[in-house]
Curated annotation (Swiss-Prot):
This is ATP synthase subunit beta. F-type ATPases have 2 components, CF(1) - the catalytic core - and CF(0) - the membrane proton channel. CF(1) has five subunits: alpha(3), beta(3), gamma(1), delta(1), epsilon(1). CF(0) has three main subunits: a(1), b(2) and c(9-12). The alpha and beta chains form an alternating ring which encloses part of the gamma chain. CF(1) is attached to CF(0) by a central stalk formed by the gamma and epsilon chains, while a peripheral stalk is formed by the delta and b chains. Belongs to the ATPase alpha/beta chains family. Its main location: membrane. It comes from Corynebacterium aurimucosum (strain ATCC 700975 / DSM 44827 / CIP 107346 / CN-1). It holds the Pfam family ATP-synt_ab_N. The keyword ATP-binding applies. It comes from the Bacteria. Gene3D superfamilies: 2.40.10.170, Bovine Mitochondrial F1-atpase, Atp Synthase Beta Chain, Chain D, domain 3 (1.10.1140.10), P-loop containing nucleotide triphosphate hydrolases (3.40.50.300). Keywords: ATP synthesis, ATP-binding, Cell membrane, CF(1), Hydrogen ion transport, Ion transport, Membrane, Nucleotide-binding, Translocase, Transport. Transmembrane segments: none annotated. ATP binds at G167, G168, A169, G170, V171, G172, K173, T174.
Length: 482
């Protein structure tokens, strides 16, 4: 279905205007009567600073009346002066799409950073697109097996769904995203798109080099809007990455994984732009259009007939406050939430997933099966009972518990440790090989632990391992030492 927005993407008119006002990254431009550019159109202006000429891209954000538009700059406006000539490109910001983007790093405007000029001669799509029509959506629900025990068992991911990684600073969100990129490339030979929203330059460089070293870069496109760039760039980079992913889904009929790190910085950039445009702030200082902006992004991330975009989004939680409007608005769109807990990380258990607060809408017998559901509920029940007993243990000690409660606590400790796992991307730090555990093995292992088959094994035998074979090997090593 052809929409007005898509028709606008292909327009090729070029209208000249002039700069009348510059306030930081916000630029007011006057156009001749009848030549007003459409909202979201890209404008270009030549800027000379210290004898160096460059082209700055602006995006139309508001129509002010009297042939004036207010635009947001996608680059620093140093050197931009009143009266400078501005050209309307007649279309939104466009990015290269297709196989050409794999293995390369782009900015929000679609410029290749590691190989300048790459992709500009090929097909390009505008970053503002309509979501798929209702009759094109896929109705079937399917599990995305990750090989990570705690996720597959307790918070299974939906193929074509949206998954949020929640947590404060330093609990492992980016590491888990890197691990998922590696697993998708290795196990499914799938295409991944990574959108770094407000990324630190160091983090982006490290990610690029690590992926190159691990041999998964050729199946991944990376798009960065770095922390030091204007808010307009950080607000649009997620849409640029999503547009590349949509091409793989809609044209090449591929299942794609879209990683967004960090969706909070997308909200934060929107808040900055909203303030610069003079909008009245809403709750906690966020933009009044927060829910709308989030919806525009999230509604495009979905499954269509036979192909999908599965999105994994890191969500920074300010001051670990889950009632903050930014994470709270994100919650509404997610199919699964994986909460990374500082308390679990402090025990040295990674991934530091909190199994009691993480959720998945597909953890239902009709979708995952009766046995999977029952084992998951037994594991959650044991961990919940252990949590309830912690106050008694802290005050009176383990000796005051009944025999049944003592067994529950001991099993919970084994389960908690066994939910940890070695990651492929962490091999160089831990010195231990990463592990992929099939879902069937995970269900079997936790069922046996819940049944008490390993009650005589010491807790150390379950530390951050893969499957039960690793537990047996660790137990054998421990008994030999004795």
């Amino acid at each position: 279905m052809t929409t007005a927005l898509q028709e606008q993407n292909t327009q090729s008119s070029a209208t000249a205007g002039r700069v009348v006002r510059v306030i930081g990254p916000v630029v007011d431009v006057e156009f001749p009567r009848g030549g007003l550019p459409a909202l979201y159109n890209a404008l270009t202006v030549e800027v000379t600073l210290e004898a160096v000429a460059k082209t700055v891209t602006l995006e139309v954000a508001q129509h002010l009346g009297d042939n004036l538009v207010r635009a947001v700059s996608m680059a620093p406006t140093d050197g931009l002066v009143r009266g400078a000539a501005v050209t309307d490109t007649g279309k939104p910001i466009s990015v290269p799409v297709g196989d050409v983007v794999k293995g390369h790093v782009f900015n929000a405007l679609g410029d290749c950073l590691d190989q300048p000029g790459l992709g500009r001669d090929g097909e390009q799509w505008g970053i503002h697109r309509e979501p798929p029509a209702f009759d094109q959506l896929e109705g079937k629900t399917e599990i995305l097996e990750t090989g990570i025990k705690v996720i597959d068992l307790l918070t299974p991911y939906v193929k074509g769904g949206k998954i949020g990684l929640f947590g404060g600073a330093g609990v492992g969100k980016t590491v888990l995203i890197q691990e998922m990129i590696t697993r998708i490339a290795r196990e499914f030979s799938g295409t991944s798109v990574f959108a770094g929203v407000g990324e630190r330059t160091r983090e982006g460089t490290d990610l690029f080099l690590e992926m190159e070293e691990m041999g998964v870069l050729q199946d991944t496109a990376l798009v960065f809007g770095q922390m030091d760039e204007p808010p307009g760039v950080r607000m649009r980079v997620a849409l640029s990455g999503l547009t590349m992913a949509e091409y793989f889904r809609d044209v090449q009929n591929q299942d794609v994984l879209l990683f967004i790190d960090n969706i909070f910085r997308f909200t934060q950039a929107g808040s900055e732009v909203s303030t610069l445009l003079g909008r009245m702030p809403s709750a906690v200082g966020y933009q009044p259009t927060l829910a709308d902006e989030m919806g525009v992004l999230q509604e495009r991330i979905t499954s269509t007939k036979g192909k999908s975009i599965t999105s994994l989004q890191a969500v920074y939680v300010p001051a670990d406050d889950y009632t903050d409007p930014a994470p709270a608005t994100t919650f509404a769109h997610l199919d699964a939430t994986t909460e990374l807990d500082r308390g679990i990380a402090s025990k040295g258990i990674y991934p530091a997933v909190n199994p009691l607060t993480s959720t998945s809408r597909i953890l239902e017998p009709s979708i995952v099966g009766e046995r999977h559901y029952e084992v998951a509920q037994r594991v959650i029940g044991i961990l919940q009972k252990n949590k309830e007993l912690q106050d008694i243990i802290a005050i009176l000690g383990m000796d005051e518990l009944s025999e049944e409660d003592k067994i529950t606590v001991q099993r919970a400790r084994r389960i908690e440790r066994f939910l940890g796992q070695n990651f492929f991307v962490a091999e160089k730090f831990t010195g231990l090989p990463g592990s992929y555990v099939p879902l069937a093995d995970t269900i079997d292992a936790f069922e046996r632990i819940c049944n008490g088959e390993f009650d005589h094994y010491p807790e150390q035998a379950f530390n951050g391992l893969g499957g039960l074979d690793d537990v047996e090997a660790a137990y054998k090593k421990l008994t030999e030492k004795k």
